[in-house]
Amino acid sequence: MKESEDLASIIQMELDKRLNTPNRGVKQAGFYVLIGASMPNVLVEVGFLSNPMEEKKLKQNMYKQQIAEAIYSAIKHFKQTREKVLAGE
């Protein structure tokens, strides 16, 4: 779904702006949890607990807040863009 890919790219861009983490890019796969959804959907992975440095970051409240704000900002941007497209602007 093109919209899902667009949303994923915007989320990745926002995460890149706010976090000092490796950009592993946007990938597509038939994730079971996303199959059958009728709306744009993405699976966001922001780190791996198997990586000690990432685990340490994921335990920090400020880091989790930055992740949440990045995702919120991306969804807001995506929604505003879609509304303009649907309105013919």
Question: What do the predicted segments below correspond to?
Answer:
Residues M1-E89:
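Active-site-proximal helix/loop segments of hydrolytic enzymes
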